[in-house]
Amino acid sequence: MVKIYPQVLSIAGSDSGGGSGIQADLKAFQTLGVFGTSVITCITAQNTQGVHGVYPLSVESVKAQILAIRDDFSIKAFKMGALCNAQIIECVADTLETCDFGLCVLDPVMVAKNGALLLEEEAILSLKKRLLPTTHLLTPNLPEVYALTGVQVRDDKSASKAMGVLRDLGVKNAVIKGGHTEHFQGEYSNDWVFLEDAEFILNAKRFNTKNTHGTGCTLSSLIVGLLAQGLDLKNAISKAKELLTIIIQNPLNIGHGHGPLNLWSIKELV
């Protein structure tokens, strides 16, 4: 009997170092046992020490990739990551209107590790107008929350305030990730989960490692894979966070900078 694997999609950038973007997404999909497809929005020259170049693809090539997936695959859920510029965002939004790819998880890659904005203002406006209202789940980190809402999240109250602004922008559900910030250096880090029918906090003990490149990409990809396998949103988020915590606690020693994640560490658990 031929086993049927759920089919999923990532629309994101390519990371030559293999730690984030499309490469991280496909590794997460494979680990979960779902079949991953991809639409590449940009090529990046990067490694564990940094990003050395970003080269957006043409809107024609992005559209062609989406249509190729639409015409041949039964996508159960999909994610979007780095979308580079307003032209690509508009292209993706327009083309997705002709597709039925299931639930969408948007990981809004907007801010570099050094705090620099990766999207220009025009692109941020397009993201807010065209993609936020149609996204099933948004997974921003704190700098991305600030870029979208103007709210500095430091505690439960400010997280709720930020979610209020996101809801005004059309966001239905969000995971506000609290791990990547100087404001939270305690024993635990919080992720604030705001769903249409529930609100809760996921906390995990901090693990002292620099090898966390691609955590945001991997979390959103794990959620997509688990949704495609039939989990509801609440359980998919909780399970993905649990798996990501195990991954971070079992780091790889690859490269000379911020190394990639160890997806092998959860192979026996999924």
UniProtKB/Swiss-Prot annotation:
InterPro entries: HMP/HMP-P_kinase_dom, PM/HMP-P_kinase-1, Ribokinase-like. Keywords: ATP-binding, Kinase, Nucleotide-binding, Thiamine biosynthesis, Transferase. The gene is thiD. GO terms for biological process: thiamine biosynthetic process; thiamine diphosphate biosynthetic process. It catalyses: 4-amino-5-hydroxymethyl-2-methylpyrimidine + ATP = 4-amino-2-methyl-5-(phosphooxymethyl)pyrimidine + ADP + H(+); 4-amino-2-methyl-5-(phosphooxymethyl)pyrimidine + ATP = 4-amino-2-methyl-5-(diphosphooxymethyl)pyrimidine + ADP. It is an enzyme of class 2 (transferase). Gene3D superfamilies: 3.40.1190.20. This is Hydroxymethylpyrimidine/phosphomethylpyrimidine kinase. It holds the Pfam family Phos_pyr_kin. Catalyzes the phosphorylation of hydroxymethylpyrimidine phosphate (HMP-P) to HMP-PP, and of HMP to HMP-P.
